Structures are given as structure tokens and as C-alpha cells.
Amino acid sequence: MKKRVLALTMALTMAFLTACSGGGGQSGTAADTGGGESGGASAETGGNSAVDAEITEPVTIKFANYAVLEAGYDVYWNGLLEKFHEENPNITVELVTAPYGEIVNTIINMAGGGDKVDVIFGEKDWIPTLVDAGLAAPVENVLSQELVADIYPNILEACSMDGVAYGVPMYISPFLMYYNKDLFEQAGLDPNSPPTTYDEMLEIAPKLAALTTEDGNQVYPFGLTTASVAVSGACLTSSVYNFGGTVLDEEGNLAIDQGFRDAVEMWKTLDDNGYNPQNSKLKDLRNLFALGQLAMYYDQSWGYNGISSINPDAESFIASAAPLKGGDGTGESVLQAGTLMVVDNGDAQKAAVAKLVDFIMSEEMLTEYFETVSPAYPARQSMADLEVIADSPILAGAADSVSNLKTVTFVPALSDLNLELCTLAQAVTVSGTDVDTAIADFETAARGILE
């Protein structure tokens, strides 16, 4: 029954995304990223022949991937590349690595010096920046038609600008809520009945805040990332959506409304009461959660990997729930995706990239990822019924959230806008600025970025 419910939920997600694609809005112009003649591929890329092309001469491709530096992900990615090389001995994959917060600038700076990578693993929200930098190429020009056609159409559309897809997600997730069942029990709360609204969360927060760990450390009731990294801005956008608010309209214009203001008021309320750790990155919240110092927090589903890497016993106390509803909102959330973006560096590289991406996106490798690294929802239609997902106790509590999504309008300055949202959150928390002044300052800065 659980498998059927999760499969149905996934289908509903796709139906929902039909009505709210993320591919609209202002977009950067994709510069010509092509060049070079074929050096060793005996078939064209961009079609079904791409993956079947025989690589007759050695070719090296550069794969930018921040995750190989992170515990819990490194073993998987290194193992995957070893298996790929065994099957494709003429293809050498050269890793380009940098910490999460630095990888995009590393890629762009390399390109400025004439050294372009061939494929990038990262966040869906990086697409506007990479397109604007003239790096990300249309996936249909590089990857196989079979693979591209298997991605849920509206997920592919959510990775598009001006109707052109620039990425294929390995997996997707909304921002969901993780909570600690053990801490709920210690506070006299029902571990099987997490809050569904921000008001309900605030009602139980004092009981959770009264707890301490065995070594006397404070327990925070609720975590919302506000540190100055782009993914924190995406999470804050999701919080605005929880309240029925808007950041950008469909045309990419700033659209501050009451739901936006209600969300910012909540960020301040959480801080005023000491409920949310100040200026925390997601990795900081994962650490606190793993150590029993955080009762609830927002994260992508794959944040579980960071938690379990710190505390292997986390599976015994972690549970998921849908994002909270606030104000007049319905608890809508932002779609997140671990995404592969490609660069057109000529036919030989394209053929090799097509093979690598197809290997990464294979059922074998995705199943291994979901089993050994972290649960998430596959973006391929052919994998809708994967048992490893249908039977996941980690995803079960938040299953309904994937049918309650609101997409983000892509603009070239999206990453910068996300950072300004972090500045806004820090203003009403760390700096103690009043909400009206902080929002006014945000509007001024955001308009400067968008214009």
C-alpha cells in the first residue's frame, strides 16, 4: 500500500507542476558554448545514438562536483566513477572540486581562463547563473533523446529558461520538515503527531526549549537556515511560500506581499524566543539535529545523509513531515533537485558526457544512491515505482508535500537574490532590525540586482 501511495503522490506532483513551471521569467542569453571538431566519437550526440556511440580514441572530460569532498557522498561518487571507467576505458573523468559555496565561482573562473568543465553536479538554482555565464548548454544538444524524454516533462521545464532545458535532475525533493521523535517524547509530545502549522509549532516550542541534552547542551525547537549561501535563500523562499507569499512574480519582478511579510515576522519571532540557531547553514542544522540539539528543521530529503554520517543511529529517531502552513498559506514548498548540467565542448566531449550522465542516471546507480547515500524522489518516469523509494520510512511522513509545490521563476541573478534574502533574515535576527525597515532595505537591494 505504501508503494502505491508514494507512486500516486509522485504522479500528483507532476500534474501539479504542469500548472506552475519554473521555466518562465526573465532569462540570461545562453552564449555559444560549442566548438571543436569530433576527436574520437563515431556517432553524434543529442540523439539515442549518443550513449551507444563507440569512443574509439581516449578522451578526457572534466566533472565539477562539490559532493566528492563531503563525507557520506565521497564513497558513492568515487565508486561510481571507478565503475564507469571500467565500462568505458577510453574515457577519463577528471574531477574538479571545491567546497559547496565555492564551486560555481570556481567553474566560472576556470572558464574565464579558457578551461571549461564538461559536466556539473549541483543545485537546480545554479542554472540561471551558468546560462548567463555562457556555460550551461541545452541538454538536448548533448544528452541522449531517450534520457531527456524520460525526465518528467514538468521537472524538465523547471530546469528551463525560455523553454530550453539546461539540466536533468538526478533526484528531486521539496523542502520538508525533519523532526526528532525522541525529543518529542521527552517533551511529553506525541512523536507521531508533528505540528502542521507555524502556530502549532510555536505552541509546543516552549516544551522542547526546556530540554537539554545529557551533557547539558541547549535544545533548539525549530531550525531554519539563514546563513549567507544561496541554498539558504532557497529555503527562505520556501518559508515565504508556506505563508502563501511571493518573492518574484511570473515575469521575474519583485512581488512583496502579506505572505512575505508574515514569513519575515516568523523568522524574527523564532529568533526573539531563541528557538532557531542564528546564522546557521544547513550543515550546521544537520549537525545539531544529529546530536539531539534540534527538535525540528527544514531540509532537502538528502540532508538525511549528513545527519546519518554524524550519527549512524539517527534512523531510530528521525521522521519527516510536510512543511508547516502559515498565515493564509497552504504550506507550499520549493522544489529542489540534485541536477546535472552540461557544457558543449565539442563532439568528442559531448559523446563522453552523454555516456557519463546516462550511467549516473541509470537505475542501478540511482538505486545505490537512494539505498546507501540518501532518500529522494527520482526524476525519471521509468523509475516511478522504485521499491527503495516506495518503502522509505524517511520519506513517508512528507510524501504529501511533493504535491504541494510552487516553482521559482528563474532569473539570471537568482543566486544573488537568494543571498539578499539571507541578508534580510540576518537583519531581523542577528542585527535586530525591525521588520518594515529590513524589508524596505531588501526591496532596494533586490531591485538593484534584478534591474
Predicted regions, residues:
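Conserved N-terminal structural module of periplasmic/extracytoplasmic solute-binding proteins
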Residues: 6, 20-129, 148, 191, ...
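Hinge/lid segment of periplasmic solute-binding proteins
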Residues: 40-54, 99, 122-176, 202, ...
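Extracytoplasmic/periplasmic substrate-recognition and gating elements
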Residues: 59, 82, 86-87, 92, ...
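Short helix-initiation/N-cap motifs at beta->coil->alpha
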Residues: 97-106, 125, 196-202, 277-291
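Periplasmic solute-binding protein
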Residues: 128-135, 155-193, 224-249, 329, ...
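Glycine-centered hinge/linker elements that transmit conformational signals in sensory
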Residues: 204-207, 250-279
